[in-house]
Amino acid sequence: MTAFRLVAVALVVVVACSTTWARSLEGSSSPVASLIRGRSLSKRANFDPSCAGVYNRELLGRLSRLCDDCYNVFREPKVATECRSNCFYNPVFVQCLEYLIPADLHEEYQAHVQTVGK
């Protein structure tokens, strides 16, 4: 009976400590705290902080893939970075769009840029 009480008390102490510790991490913005709370740091891997519009993973993925394809065609490092600059609102993105995407889809891609952009 004494062993049971000791285990019960130990369990209560562990739960109380873990709850207090978890609460102390709620206000923390460190990467470790984010992982502990069960949030993935890679959820917004394609997210560009210059994009002030609607966060839409699918649209950002499509726009980012266009830049990746453009880089794969031209193999110039500046293409990959400049294509994504200013949240895809730049001349390099437009050139990649014109080179790789059929003309009837250009307006759709421009609308995507407007949605995720400024």
UniProtKB/Swiss-Prot annotation:
Residue positions, PTM Valine amide: 116
Cellular compartments per GO CC: extracellular region
Keyword Signal among record annotations: yes
Subcellular location: Secreted
Cleaved signal peptide residues: 1-22
Listed InterPro entries: Crust_neurhormone_CS (IPR018251), Crust_neurohorm (IPR031098), Crust_neurohorm_sf (IPR035957), Hyperglycemic (IPR001166), Hyperglycemic1 (IPR000346)
GO biological process, one term: circadian rhythm
GO molecular function: neuropeptide hormone activity
Keywords: Amidation, Carbohydrate metabolism, Cleavage on pair of basic residues, Disulfide bond, Glucose metabolism, Hormone, Neuropeptide, Secreted, Signal
Main localisation: secreted
SS bonds (residue pairs): 51-87, 67-83, 70-96
Superkingdom of source: Eukaryota
Family: Belongs to the arthropod CHH/MIH/GIH/VIH hormone family.
Function: Hormone found in the sinus gland of isopods and decapods which controls the blood sugar level. Has a secretagogue action over the amylase released from the midgut gland. May act as a stress hormone and may be involved in the control of molting and reproduction.
Entry protein name: Crustacean hyperglycemic hormones 2
Lineage: Eukaryota, Metazoa, Ecdysozoa, Arthropoda, Crustacea
